[in-house]
Amino acid sequence: MSEKIRVLLYYKYVSIENAQEYAAKHLEFCKSIGLKGRILIADEGINGTVSGDYETTQKYMDWVHSDERFADLWFKIDEENQQAFRKMFVRYKKEIVHLGLEDNNFDSDINPLETTGEYLNPKQFKEALLDEDTVVLDTRNDYEYDLGHFRGAIRPDIRNFRELPQWVRDNKDKFMEKRVVVYCTGGVRCEKFSGWMVREGFKDVGQLHGGIATYGKDPEVQGELWDGAMYVFDDRISVPINHVNPTVISKDYFDGTPCERYVNCANPFCNKQIFASEENETKYVRGCSPECRAHERNRYVQENGLSRQGWAERLEAIGESLPEFVGA
């Protein structure tokens, strides 16, 4: 019988004195109750996703809320049948969201407690999606968008979040005078990014309050106008959002059939994220190219204990071969 697990997604921008010391204390408590997950703590706040059974997660929420700095912290809760994490990490970072402004010769970082976009609830955000005069901008990484996104949302031509400010500046003339609404997984990235857009001179900037995770749970909108699944940074990889008319938009890297199963290329020097069915992962030894499939450090081969002969037979079946220098 599977175990009933709760996954908690949360963040809060709040000044934390001695944040490094608090991170150590936080980790100690989490381990003492058997919680698992990943938490970032910085001078500017806290951002985390954790999982555990009902009793464990309730103890954690009560403990966090007992600190006056986090008394109103909003936990978004998913019910699952298995743990979303295998270990517990609490790390101190300079920022809970790194927008990369100072790294890329932009102005100083944004404080969302001082400057941020207008909060939109799920109903208001759905109305924005249907408004032809509103620009909807996805602020996540490209591989997150490719698994699922809001219908009609712009996919910036970027690899990761830190490249977004430059992309916006390069394309400013396309939507500077329009209403712009942004969204991300749980809201933490949009708090900072929408504030940056306001500072850049955009006159009408909104953000989906609570992120995609909240939109999918809203009893009125029920995730409608979301296509695909939502990428999450834990062992689940993806979660459903649209409970009205769900669709699969991502396609298997190898044969183009509908697929929402993300894997990393088995070549550790490539590590490209691709969609692949279990059948195709086996067939192509999880390699995204002939070079990766035949790489001497192919992780699929190592994980599954394939002999050199077995490996060669897999590749021969798809018209490829192992180079002579690959060891047994």
Curated annotation (Swiss-Prot):
A single MF term (Gene Ontology): oxidoreductase activity, acting on paired donors, with incorporation or reduction of molecular oxygen
UniProtKB keywords: Oxidoreductase, tRNA processing
PROSITE patterns per UniProt: RHODANESE_3 (PS50206)
Domain of life: Bacteria
A single GO BP: tRNA modification
Gene3D superfamilies: 3.30.70.100, Rhodanese-like domain (3.40.250.10)
Location of the Rhodanese domain: 130-224
Protein name in the entry: tRNA uridine(34) hydroxylase
Top-level taxonomy: Bacteria, Bacillati, Bacillota, Bacilli, Lactobacillales
Gene: trhO
